[in-house]
């Protein structure tokens, strides 16, 4: 049985979340609280497996409460967020502080998505209850430069995640990388993981990066802006018609897909709603397939932490066209779903701990 504490100043939300969660016989809401101070008391009392935490509350807000939880009694925390720019910025800060994911607060609205939201909530609670959390993503070693060999990333299956990385054997590199486009698919637990990876890449990174992160439309712009402020490379929300540039990461806008298309003299970004019936928007499958079809062996596909199997079908195409693939290790995922699908399908060329992912990507451009 998975125990949950719900912390929210809205009586409606406390009731709604509790009702949704307890529809699953494996989940029990052991207590609720109306603000952060009361929340800390009931968390200490009940020691729950998972906490859902509102951001805006009287007396003690969600971010302050989260800091106390992470310092005193770390456990998986799901933030309850409004789908606004302000809500997005606060939620991204919460993810940086240690929250594992977020759920939308607009549960009071009549919506055709309510069943999906309920299912996602229960699935997230069940998945994150099994996993350890990623801490605030700060670089753990100096970023490699494009002209100097990076350390070889450690394969998770060969050694524990806590083992030190071994220096790479000097690699004989071509004057230009073999691969010049990196496609990244990621979901639950993704923002801290993406920040950890991108913040370790050098400003002269010789490839373009395209990222499909499962995230609402109001969140992707602030997410890109936050990353751009802490990374040596440029990070932006993708716009149709842009020419792909090395040393730039393009974040797919929430609610839309990200593709690339060959033009006469360059590769171009395409933002689209097609296919409309895709389970996720943005979709890692759509991104991987497009990059595979357009770039062939010039593509490097990376699947990071996330629920489900989005990215697997697209990765099949990328691999068939000569691309290379990397999956995040089980030991370092918040949720080992999307990477597991790649590994189980035999599509992963490397399985890498998140701390070593930037180095693996650097080296992967030359393989």
From Swiss-Prot:
Protein name according to UniProt: Protein-glutamate methylesterase/protein-glutamine glutaminase 2
Enzyme Commission number, as recorded: 3.1.1.61, 3.5.1.44
HAMAP family the UniProt entry points to: CheB_chemtxs
Post-translational events: Phosphorylated by CheA. Phosphorylation of the N-terminal regulatory domain activates the methylesterase activity.
SUPFAM superfamilies: CheY-like, Methylesterase CheB, C-terminal domain
Record field: transmembrane: none
Enzyme class: hydrolase
GO cellular component, one term: cytoplasm
Keyword list, A-Z: Chemotaxis, Cytoplasm, Hydrolase, Phosphoprotein
Compartments where found: Cytoplasm
Source organism of this protein record: Nitratidesulfovibrio vulgaris (strain ATCC 29579 / DSM 644 / CCUG 34227 / NCIMB 8303 / VKM B-1760 / Hildenborough) (Desulfovibrio vulgaris)
List of residues that carry 4-aspartylphosphate: 54
Every CheB-type methylesterase domain range: 175-367
Main localization of the protein described in the UniProt heading: cytoplasm
Domain free text: Contains a C-terminal catalytic domain, and an N-terminal region which modulates catalytic activity.
């Amino acid at each position: 049985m998975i125990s949950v504490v719900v912390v929210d100043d809205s009586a409606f939300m406390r009731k709604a979340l509790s009702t949704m969660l307890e529809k699953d016989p494996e989940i029990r809401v052991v207590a609720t609280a109306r603000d952060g101070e009361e929340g800390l008391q009931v968390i200490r009392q009940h020691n729950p497996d998972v906490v859902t935490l509102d951001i805006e509350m009287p007396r003690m807000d969600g971010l302050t409460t989260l800091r106390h939880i992470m310092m005193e009694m770390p456990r998986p925390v799901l933030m309850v967020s409004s789908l606004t720019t302000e809500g997005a910025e606060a939620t991204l800060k919460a993810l940086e502080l240690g929250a594992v994911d977020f759920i939308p607060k607009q549960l009071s609205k009549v919506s055709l998505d309510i069943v999906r939201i309920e299912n996602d909530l229960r699935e997230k609670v069940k998945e994150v209850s099994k996993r350890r959390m990623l801490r605030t993503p700060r670089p753990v070693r100096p970023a490699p430069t494009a002209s100097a060999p990076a350390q070889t990333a450690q394969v998770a299956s060969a050694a524990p995640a806590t083992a030190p990385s071994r220096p790479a054997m000097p690699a004989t590199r071509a004057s230009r990388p073999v691969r010049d486009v990196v496609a990244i698919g990621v979901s639950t637990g993704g923002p801290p993981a993406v920040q950890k990876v991108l913040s370790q890449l050098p400003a002269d990174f010789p490839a373009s990066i395209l990222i499909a992160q499962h995230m609402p439309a109001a969140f992707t712009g602030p997410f890109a802006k936050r990353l751009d402020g802490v990374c040596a490379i440029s990070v932006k929300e993708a716009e149709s018609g842009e020419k792909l540039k090395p040393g730039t990461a393009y974040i797919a806008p929430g609610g839309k897909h990200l593709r690339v298309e060959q033009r006469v003299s360059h590769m171009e970004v395409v933002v689209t709603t097609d296919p409309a019936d895709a389970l996720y928007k943005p979709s890692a499958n759509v991104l991987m397939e497009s990059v595979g079809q357009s770039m062939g062996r010039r593509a490097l596909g990376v699947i990071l932490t996330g629920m489900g199997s989005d990215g697997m079908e697209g990765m099949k195409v990328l691999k068939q066209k000569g691309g290379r693939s990397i999956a995040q290790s089980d030991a370092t995922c918040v949720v080992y779903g999307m990477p597991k699908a790649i590994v189980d399908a035999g599509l992963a060329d490397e399985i890498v701990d998140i701390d070593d992912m930037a180095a693996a990507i650097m080296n992967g451009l030359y393989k």
